[in-house]
Amino acid sequence: MTPILNHYFARINWSGAAAVNIDTLRALHLKHNCTIPFENLDVLLPREIQLDDQSLEEKLVIARRGGYCFEQNGVFERVLRELEFNVRSLLGRVVLSNPPALPPRTHRLLLVELEEEKWIADVGFGGQTLTAPIRLVSDLVQTTPHGDYRLLQEGDDWVLQFNHHQHWQSMYRFDLCEQQQSDYVMGNFWSAHWPQSHFRHHLLMCRHLPDGGKLTLTNFHFTHYENGHAVEQRNLPDVASLYAVMQEQFGLGVDLSLIHISEP
């Protein structure tokens, strides 16, 4: 087994078999979502986000940090490739909470071809991310551990939607065109540096739970969800409380001496 797989499996506490099949893909997808938190801390500090294999491994795996889509799906793609899955990254346009005009391609997701079927995997869309792969099939409701999703085909584009309290809400749209590393670098740079990017203005964290719940942090507001409903909400009174939640609830390996956040 390669070093990255040893380190990654230790990171997500995985001791199962690693056969190239849909059961392995589902299990790794959920384990990843429940262990490696979505977070944008480096954008706010600010620290440049590097997308090369070594940087992603050192940050998300060795240093026990999280990241956003370019990092999360970058690591997951590498792991699947090391396991000999047929996988490649795609780029999508986020339409959730965006104006009607089409935004640039700033979301990284994965296409996995397995057992003569195509699957979409995505461990990097924050609180609404998939926690299981779904088939690349149009207008089929597909259940994951954290809710129902569907894909709609519109010409060459696909639109991913999630069921939000019985209302279908679009998340992002994408096509199956081949992308290059430079495309991910460009999307990452835009997401981290565009003045209106929400990653530049809000601290965002999410970790999914194996029982179908999830934990979120938006600035100093912490929420615990079960079955899509908030069962605990609290405003953190100070930076010390924020640091504690980062470590205790999100398992974030952060050197607090290197982080400076203003009091609320």
Predicted feature residues:
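Residues at alpha-helix termini
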Residues: 11, 82, 248-249
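Residue-level detector of conserved catalytic or cofactor/ligand-binding positions
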Residues: 257-264
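Secondary-structure boundary elements
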Residues: 1-64
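Hydrophobic/aromatic-rich core segments of domains that either
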Residues: 74, 78-144, 148
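Short Gly/charged-rich anion-binding patches and loops
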Residues: 4, 75, 241-242
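Acidic/His-leaning functional-site neighborhoods
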Residues: 154-251
